[in-house]
């Protein structure tokens, strides 16, 4: 297979993988109130897809997943969001771990 065709096929597979991750993300969001375990399973599938295809999880999805127990985080349901000294601190209510994301203060 020529190099250009191989690259085109790889791009197609990566696009399909990203679309599937977004679809699973939406399903996890819908399933969380009724069935949290199924929601966690969808998050695990997102991680498996990204590892299998060696692509990173999109930032919008990654920020809604606990980095320790891989549960889907929803503010007010199973996560606590706080602003603390230039950081957004997200506390997972399932495992109790905290994730810190910096933000830029407006002058």
From Swiss-Prot:
Positions of Zn(2+) binding: 66, 69, 92, 95
Cofactor: Zn(2+)
Cofactor: how and how many bound: Binds 1 zinc ion per subunit.
A Gene Ontology molecular function term of the record: zinc ion binding
One GO cellular component term noted in the UniProt record for this chain: cytoplasm
Compartments, record wording: Cytoplasm
Reactions the enzyme catalyzes: Endonucleolytic cleavage of RNA, removing 5'-extranucleotides from tRNA precursor
UniProt keywords, alphabetically: Cytoplasm, Endonuclease, Hydrolase, Metal-binding, Nuclease, tRNA processing, Zinc
UniProt cross-references to PANTHER family, sorted A to Z: RIBONUCLEASE P PROTEIN SUBUNIT P21, RIBONUCLEASE P SUBUNIT P21
Quaternary context: Consists of a catalytic RNA component and at least 4-5 protein subunits.
Function summary: Part of ribonuclease P, a protein complex that generates mature tRNA molecules by cleaving their 5'-ends.
This protein's name: Ribonuclease P protein component 4
Phylogenetic placement of the source organism: Archaea, Methanobacteriati, Methanobacteriota, Stenosarchaea group, Methanomicrobia
